[in-house]
Swiss-Prot record:
It is found in: Cytoplasm. Pfam families: PCMT. Catalyzes the methyl esterification of L-isoaspartyl residues in peptides and proteins that result from spontaneous decomposition of normal L-aspartyl and L-asparaginyl residues. It plays a role in the repair and/or degradation of damaged proteins. This is Protein-L-isoaspartate O-methyltransferase. It catalyses: [protein]-L-isoaspartate + S-adenosyl-L-methionine = [protein]-L-isoaspartate alpha-methyl ester + S-adenosyl-L-homocysteine. The gene is pcm. One of its GO terms (molecular function) is protein-L-isoaspartate (D-aspartate) O-methyltransferase activity. Its main location: cytoplasm.
């Protein structure tokens, strides 16, 4: 159930659901999702559903991964990408295939250590990762051409908007409980354009670090 054929069936399902960016679909074909979940769940890795990864966190539904990546990377190859919430590392790995350098922050140490081992196994040499409260971003490495947030704050953190480079994009779920909206912010000089796209469901973006 983890064969390339199984992976390709998922890709065709994503196409039918409206994902059109070929670079995104190719990255999701090449990155094996089953290595980002526990072995007991590997047989479900290519279902279009979120799966638990421990510590009350999930690996996102493939459609959502594809949709957010398409919004972030469509029409260009960002050089510097910040990801807030590495989780299993799956979304990070997809971004690494579509950008020059990915900086990812994760607040739960055991998840981050597992993710780093997966990056090494996949020879993803363009990923830098650190244990941190993601709400603060990674200001020492900014500004970023693109920022993706994989957990939902109640409001968009101003610190992340400040780390967005001119011409850059931020893709983020915003809201609490079941009232979350997927938003895209685009910076043009001092102006930031905000778009609300569709309802989504993510774990909340929490503060602090768990060791």
């Amino acid at each position: 159930m983890t064969s390339r054929r199984t992976r390709l069936r998922l890709i065709e399902r994503l196409r039918k659901n409206g994902i059109q960016n070929e670079a995104v679909l190719e990255a999701m074909t090449e990155i094996p999702r089953h290595i980002f979940v526990d072995e007991a769940l590997a047989h479900r890795a290519y279902e279009d559903t979120a799966l638990p990864i421990g510590h009350s966190q999930t690996i996102s539904q493939p459609y959502i991964v594809a949709r957010m990546t398409e919004l972030l990377c469509s029409g260009w190859k960002p050089k510097r990408v910040l990801e807030v919430g590495a989780g299993s590392g799956y979304q990070t790995a997809i971004l690494a295939r579509l950008s020059t350098q990915v900086y990812t922050v994760e607040r739960i140490a055991p998840l981050l250590e597992k993710a780093k081992l997966r990056f090494k196994a996949l020879k993803l040499n363009n990923v830098s990762a650190k244990l941190s409260d993601g709400r603060w971003g990674w200001p020492e490495q900014g500004p970023f051409d693109a920022i993706m947030v994989t957990a939902a704050p109640e409001q968009t953190p101003s610190e992340l908007l400040e780390q967005l480079a001119d011409g850059g994009r931020l893709v983020i779920p915003v809201g609490s409980g079941s009232e979350q909206m997927l938003k895209v912010y685009k910076r043009q000089g001092a102006e930031i354009e905000e778009s609300s796209l569709e309802q989504v469901r993510f774990v909340p973006l929490l503060g602090g670090v768990v060791r």
